[in-house]
């Protein structure tokens, strides 16, 4: 369950999370299951980055509503609060309501141009319903990591150091 990366980034207890996927009534596109090394490489980072975008917006909303600048604020999994006085803050729910009132990028009424078309449609469908954290992860460089293991049986001539390969087996996870 790769959404756990977003939950951990937002410091939200996993028990308080609801995963909803593949529900077009809620503007969530159908997708394949999440498994394999390629999925971990691509989707884990994207979930983390979307959560970082939400955190940035939570802090900016708190600064706009409560005063100061975004860097004056932090999160604890349920609230965004002033680091100098943690009694000055707001719940994630209150910040989501403020996002609706503020509009623009906070509520998904505007979003980055470089998003995938499916993601754009999802954001458009969710716009105005709360705080929207959304990004396109374009940092991927190189090939996704893969995992492989090989086993070799040899016959070794201990006098000459020469060997003969008797059997070889290899298993590779090529990603999904």
Features from the language model and the residues they span:
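Cofactor-binding beta-sheet edge motifs in enzyme active sites
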Residues: 1-176
